[in-house]
């Protein structure tokens, strides 16, 4: 049986996120894969372990969210409410990052892409500042990076034992959100592969191949895939994704 889910992606380290309706008629999951809708993953953890945090334990972040009354400060123990933000849509919020001495060290935009059971947070760093003097660093080149991928993991007992699931949706890297991603997971032989097309900039008019990778059990009780990202057969990096949702509804 072949089924379909919707999928979106932040493409810097080629991190993917996807949503669907496993167990409730998978064939209908692609009726509106690009349409924003309410609900979905509700809360971001700002701190965290294993290099998956938005800020470090001694840092403070100021986030500007007009829907929540303007700019507020948060530390690594705080959670950030995104329940009012729409799924299948990139939400961009201005931020300032402060070090342990409360000195501003960078500013830019947080790009949040959320689905039903997961969220991906990217950071467009537009300015950097000296952590001691607070002066802006000249000739700084802005860049985009994926900061955190989090959500409700698919547990071992919940992973499908058979069938091919096709994940489709948006591919984006910062302000470039015109790309399309297509990824298949074969739960019968536990492998996955796909492509990214339509990105601008360095990858304009090129197909990024997400080479076949094995679906394996990660640390405690969740599953993921890691493989090579190629252009014209040449390795250009790696991609990593994990399964999210009670019925392998999403990958991120």
Descriptions of predicted regions:
Residues 15-18:
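C-terminal motif of bacterial Sec signal peptides marking the signal peptidase cleavage site
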Residues 20-252:
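Mature soluble binding/inhibitory domains
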């Amino acid at each position: 049986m072949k089924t379909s889910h919707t999928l979106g992606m932040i493409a810097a380290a080629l991190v993917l996120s996807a949503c669907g309706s496993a167990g409730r008629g998978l064939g209908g999951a692609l009726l509106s894969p690009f349409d924003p809708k309410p609900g979905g993953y509700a809360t971001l953890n700002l701190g965290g372990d294993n290099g998956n945090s938005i800020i470090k334990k001694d840092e403070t972040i100021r986030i500007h969210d007009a829907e929540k009354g303007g700019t507020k400060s948060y530390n690594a123990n705080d959670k950030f409410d995104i329940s009012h933000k729409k799924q299948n849509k990139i939400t961009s919020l201005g931020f300032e990052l402060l070090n342990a001495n409360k000195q501003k060290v960078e500013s830019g935009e947080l790009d949040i892409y959320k689905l039903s059971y997961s969220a991906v947070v990217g950071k467009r760093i537009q300015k950097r500042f000296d952590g001691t003097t607070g002066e802006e660093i000249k000739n700084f080149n802005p860049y985009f990076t994926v900061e955190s991928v989090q959500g409700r993991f698919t547990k071992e007992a919940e992973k499908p034992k058979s069938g091919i699931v096709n994940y489709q949706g948006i591919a984006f890297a910062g302000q470039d959100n015109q790309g399309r991603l297509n990824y298949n997971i074969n739960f019968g032989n536990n492998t996955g592969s796909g492509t990214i097309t339509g990105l601008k900039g360095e990858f304009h008019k090129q197909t990024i191949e997400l080479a076949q990778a094995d679906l394996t059990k990660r640390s405690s009780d969740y599953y993921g895939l890691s493989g090579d990202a190629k252009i014209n057969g040449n390795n250009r990096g790696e991609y990593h994704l994990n399964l999210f949702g009670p019925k392998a509804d999403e990958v991120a």
